[in-house]
């Protein structure tokens, strides 16, 4: 090999010399590969396991180092966040102190300023105590600004039972415009309305009996008309029953006060008894039997509840 390298001259190479040089280089590389293969063949299984273990240890150490680095970075980040929070709080407190000192310096002299600075620290505690303190019963009422104020104000002493719809009202029957309502006198004045009510009921019944008219109506319209007819009949019947009850009570009071100088007025309980007696006297035989049977069952139920197995243990 040294012979060829010594005799090499630039510009005087031949093809045979180049071929010889290539063969020599190929032989050297082949010898090196064979030597490395022989070295690997001579290695035992134990040494290979040790090498694998060393590589695994190096990989684990690298992963542990990365985990430690991550932990350190997280701790640093948390410390920075806490420092930022503390700095913000300090900045807010300094601003609050600057504002309080400015207001105190404008209000008076230096001595007075020191006095007011001590009080300003306690103002926050006083406000919180006032909020937590319960209001006095004689204090003015407070309403939420989010709710709209009602157009009609509540006047003490004028608590009236408001109907479901207050859209239309008659001022003649309002307590604020006159005396208490006398139902009997109003009933006498407007007794002629019963005739109009009866006419409306008769007309509605005639319309519902007409088959041609009913066939033109839909199911919903027909049901609405039947409901209106039923409600009109019940209203008229209640008005008539009320008139009859007042008439019966009036006749009974006139009868018991026939020869008395001082007029005696019945109580509400006595009025109920008089009405029950009058209704029972003017009932038919079947109606009386039903009433007596109902009362007998009611009395039997009360007696049955008094037994020991119904008593609470």
Curated annotation (Swiss-Prot):
User: Which residue ranges have biased composition labelled Basic residues?
Assistant: 127-138, 145-154
Q: Where is this region: Disordered?
A: 1-166
* Compartments where found: Nucleus, Nucleolus
**Gene Ontology process terms (BP):** maturation of SSU-rRNA from tricistronic rRNA transcript (SSU-rRNA, 5.8S rRNA, LSU-rRNA)
Q: Which PANTHER family match?
A: RIBOSOMAL RNA PROCESSING PROTEIN 36 HOMOLOG
Q: Which UniProt keywords apply?
A: Coiled coil, Nucleus, Ribonucleoprotein, Ribosome biogenesis, rRNA processing
Subunit architecture: Associates with 90S and pre-40S pre-ribosomal particles.
- Its chief place of residence is nucleus
For this record, an example GO cellular component is: nucleolus
Q: Which residues form a coiled coil?
A: 64-95
Protein name per its UniProtKB record: rRNA biogenesis protein RRP36
Compositionally biased spans, kind Basic and acidic residues:
67-93
Give a short account of what the protein does.
Answer: Component of the 90S pre-ribosome involved in the maturation of rRNAs. Required for early cleavages of the pre-RNAs in the 40S ribosomal subunit maturation pathway.
Biased composition, class Acidic residues, residue ranges: 54-66, 94-122
> InterPro entries given for it?
RRP36 (IPR009292)
Q: Which family does it belong to?
A: Belongs to the RRP36 family.
Q: Which organism is it from?
A: Vanderwaltozyma polyspora (strain ATCC 22028 / DSM 70294 / BCRC 21397 / CBS 2163 / NBRC 10782 / NRRL Y-8283 / UCD 57-17)
């Amino acid at each position: 090999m040294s012979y060829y390298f010594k005799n090499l001259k630039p510009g005087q190479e031949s093809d045979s010399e180049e071929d010889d040089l290539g063969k020599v280089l190929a032989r050297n590389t082949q010898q090196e590969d064979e030597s490395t293969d022989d070295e690997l063949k001579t290695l035992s299984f134990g040494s290979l396991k040790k090498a694998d273990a060393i590589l695994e240890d190096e990989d684990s150490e690298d992963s542990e180092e990365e985990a430690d680095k991550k932990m350190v970075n997280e701790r640093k980040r948390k410390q920075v966040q806490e420092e930022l929070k503390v700095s913000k709080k300090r900045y807010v407190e300094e601003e609050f102190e600057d504002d309080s000192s400015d207001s105190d310096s404008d209000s008076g002299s230096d001595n007075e300023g020191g006095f007011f600075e001590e009080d300003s620290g306690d103002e926050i505690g006083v406000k919180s105590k006032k909020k937590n303190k319960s209001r006095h019963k004689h204090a003015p009422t407070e309403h939420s600004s989010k709710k709209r104020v009602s157009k009609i104000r509540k006047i003490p002493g004028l608590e009236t039972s408001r109907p479901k719809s207050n859209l239309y009202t008659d001022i003649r029957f309002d307590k604020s415009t006159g005396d208490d309502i006398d139902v009997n006198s109003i009933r006498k004045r407007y007794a002629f309305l019963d005739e109009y009510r009866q006419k409306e009921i008769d007309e509605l019944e005639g319309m519902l009996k007409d088959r041609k008219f009913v066939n033109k109506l839909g199911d919903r319209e027909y049901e609405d008309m039947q409901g209106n007819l039923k409600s009109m009949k019940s209203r008229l019947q209640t008005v008539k029953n009320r008139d009859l009850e007042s008439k019966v009570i009036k006749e009974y009071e006139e009868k018991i006060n026939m020869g008395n100088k001082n007029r005696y007025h019945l109580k509400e309980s006595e009025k109920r008894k008089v009405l029950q007696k009058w209704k029972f006297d003017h009932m038919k035989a079947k109606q009386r039997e039903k009433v007596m049977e109902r009362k007998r069952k009611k009395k039997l139920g009360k007696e049955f509840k008094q037994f020991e197995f119904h008593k609470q243990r």
